[in-house]
C-alpha cells in the first residue's frame, strides 16, 4: 500500500471520528430541544415556580445563577489573571515555577464535589457565612481559578518576545511592559477564556449543593448572605428528588434547554468579543 493511500485512509478515519463527535453533540441538543422548546415563553423566564415546581417559571433560578456567576468571576478573574502574569512574566524557569504549574493543573483536576465540601467546611461553617451567595461565589471562584490561570498563561505565551524586547529597548520597566504592551495584546484570549469558564461555572451543581442552593424560595435574595435558587440545582431537584418528579418532567427539559442556550450564547459571545478585541489591538 502506497504512502498516499495510507494518508487518505488516515484522513478519512479522522474525518469520520470528527463527524461522530458532532453527531453525538447534535443528538444531545436535539434530544433536549425537542422536549424543552415548548416550555420557552415569557412566563417561563419571568414567573416564580408554582404547584410543586410543575408550573410557573424559573425566574429565581435564573437570577440566582447570574448572581453566582458574577460573584465567582469577581473572585477568579483578578486572582487568576495576576497569578498567570506572575507565573509567566516574573518567575524564572525553575523548580518553583514547575511546581506552581503542577499544583495548578492538579487543582483543575479536582472533582467539583470536593470543592463543594471544602467550601462548606471553610466558608459555610468555619467563616460562618452560612449557606449564602458569598459562600457559593467563593467556592465557584476557586473552582474557576485554575482555568483562568492557565488561560492567562497561554495568552501570554502566545505573545512574541520581540514585543517585550522592543519595550525594554525603549526604556520601559517590566511593569510598564506588562501593563502597556503585553496585557492589552493578550486580553482578547484572556477574556475569551474567562467567558468560557463562566459556562463551566454556571452548570456546576455539586459546589452550590453544599454552599448556597435552595430547593425553593418564595422571594428573590436581598443580601449576599441569603440563599438562592440556581438552574443546575433546580434541574437536579425536579428531575430526581422533587415531590412531583413525573409531573415536572417538562419543566426539567425546559430548564436544561435554558442552560444549554446560556452556554451556547456565551460561546458565541466569546468568539465575537475575541474578534472585536483582536481587531482593536491590531488597529492600535
Predicted feature locations:
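Generic hydrophobic transmembrane alpha-helix motif, especially the helices
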Residues: 105-142
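Transmembrane alpha-helices
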Residues: 73, 174-212
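Transmembrane-helix boundary motif in ABC transporter permease subunits
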Residues: 3, 72-104, 117, 125, ...
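C-terminal transmembrane helix and the adjacent membrane-cytosol boundary/short C-terminal tail
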Residues: 153-157, 161, 168, 195, ...
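Transmembrane alpha-helix signature in integral membrane proteins
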Residues: 56-86, 194
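Transmembrane alpha-helical segments of polytopic membrane transport and secretion proteins
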Residues: 1-18, 270-284
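Amphipathic cytosolic juxtamembrane alpha-helices at the membrane-cytosol interface
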Residues: 79, 92-96, 164-192
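Interhelical loop and adjacent transmembrane-helix boundary motif
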Residues: 52-56, 208-260
Amino acid at each position: 500500500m502506497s504512502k498516499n493511500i495510507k494518508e487518505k485512509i488516515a484522513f478519512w478515519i479522522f474525518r469520520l471520528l470528527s463527524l461522530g463527535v458532532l453527531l453525538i453533540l447534535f443528538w444531545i441538543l436535539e434530544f433536549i430541544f425537542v422536549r424543552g422548546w415548548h416550555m420557552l415563553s415569557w412566563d417561563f423566564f419571568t414567573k416564580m415556580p408554582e404547584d410543586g415546581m410543575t408550573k410557573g417559571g424559573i425566574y429565581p433560578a435564573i437570577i440566582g445563577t447570574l448572581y453566582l456567576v458574577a460573584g465567582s468571576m469577581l473572585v477568579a478573574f483578578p486572582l487568576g489573571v495576576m497569578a498567570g502574569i506572575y507565573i509567566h512574566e516574573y518567575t524564572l524557569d525553575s523548580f518553583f515555577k514547575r511546581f506552581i504549574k503542577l499544583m495548578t493543573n492538579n487543582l483543575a483536576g479536582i472533582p467539583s464535589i470536593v470543592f463543594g465540601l471544602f467550601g462548606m467546611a471553610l466558608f459555610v461553617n468555619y467563616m460562618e457565612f452560612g449557606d449564602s451567595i458569598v459562600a457559593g461565589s467563593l467556592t465557584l471562584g476557586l473552582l474557576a481559578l485554575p482555568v483562568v490561570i492557565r488561560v492567562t498563561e497561554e495568552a501570554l505565551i502566545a505573545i512574541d518576545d520581540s514585543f517585550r524586547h522592543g519595550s525594554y529597548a525603549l526604556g520601559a520597566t517590566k511593569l510598564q511592559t506588562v501593563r502597556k504592551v503585553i496585557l492589552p495584546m493578550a486580553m482578547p484570549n484572556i477574556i475569551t477564556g474567562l467567558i468560557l469558564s463562566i459556562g463551566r461555572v454556571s452548570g456546576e451543581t455539586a459546589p452550590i449543593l453544599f454552599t448556597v442552593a435552595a430547593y425553593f424560595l418564595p422571594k428573590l435574595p436581598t443580601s449576599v448572605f441569603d440563599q438562592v435558587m440556581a438552574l443546575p440545582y433546580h434541574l437536579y431537584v425536579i428531575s430526581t428528588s422533587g415531590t412531583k418528579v413525573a409531573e415536572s418532567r417538562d419543566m426539567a427539559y425546559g430548564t436544561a434547554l435554558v442552560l444549554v442556550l446560556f452556554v451556547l450564547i456565551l460561546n458565541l459571545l466569546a468568539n465575537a468579543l475575541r474578534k472585536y478585541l483582536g481587531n482593536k489591538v491590531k488597529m492600535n
